[in-house]
């Protein structure tokens, strides 16, 4: 049974029904249509983590830290709403519009925004550039399907520019595919170095080690 399988996994593993799988994985691959925000449910409201750069919400003026209270005439606060229901109210056909009421700290009244839904490109690496002659900077905002490829491209660019040290910025990164995160860590570690270990509910431990030579094993890394 599903519950029996979960008993052998780690305490953070949950079962995702088939009907919800497309929604859960959508933001981890390709483009999708929406308002362009990353959010989490805080207590009984929707808290915006960030508005995706150049996305519909960012263009409309929505910012990280905002709380979305209403979408059109639908209430989006209260403990009764699940993430799936919230997403259904925020998503819609491309070029359709949604009127949002937003609470912003420091503002005396709710703010009104009209957001035109659009195609949101999913980029995992926001930036890769040199801070000094030796120090390169790379910002990874999630661990999605395309992240490793984007990361490799960024690292190669920085090495070409002379980087011998890397500042890896993971702020506001909500996570994603564990295997992709392992691939990235592997680029910094020598062969057979421990990357991570997982411990299931029965206490069984599984370890993952660095494999082949990484692209940045010799330089310093700051996270």
Model-flagged regions — what are they?
Residues 65-67:
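Structural motif
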């Amino acid at each position: 049974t599903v519950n029996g399988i979960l008993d052998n996994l780690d305490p953070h593993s949950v079962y995702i029904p088939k009907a919800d799988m497309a929604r859960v994985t959508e933001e981890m691959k390709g483009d999708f249509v929406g308002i362009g925000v990353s959010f989490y449910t805080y207590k009984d409201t929707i808290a915006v983590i960030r508005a995706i750069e150049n996305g519909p919400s960012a263009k409309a003026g929505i910012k990280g830290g905002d709380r979305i209270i209403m979408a059109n005439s639908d209430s989006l606060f209260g403990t009764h709403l699940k993430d799936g229901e919230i997403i259904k109210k925020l998503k819609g056909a491309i070029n359709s519009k949604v009127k949002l009421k937003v609470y912003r700290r420091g503002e005396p009244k709710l703010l009104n925004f009209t957001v035109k839904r659009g195609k949101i490109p999913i980029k995992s690496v926001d930036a890769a550039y040199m801070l000094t002659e030796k120090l390169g900077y790379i910002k990874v905002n999630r661990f999605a399907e395309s992240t490793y490829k984007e990361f490799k491209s960024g690292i190669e660019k920085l090495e070409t520019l002379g980087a011998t040290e890397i500042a890896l910025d993971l702020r506001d990164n909500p996570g994603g595919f564990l295997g992709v995160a392992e691939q990235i860590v592997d680029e910094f570690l020598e062969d057979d170095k421990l990357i991570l270990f997982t411990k299931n509910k029965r206490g069984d431990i599984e370890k993952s080690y660095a494999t082949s030579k990484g692209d940045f094993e010799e330089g310093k890394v700051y996270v």
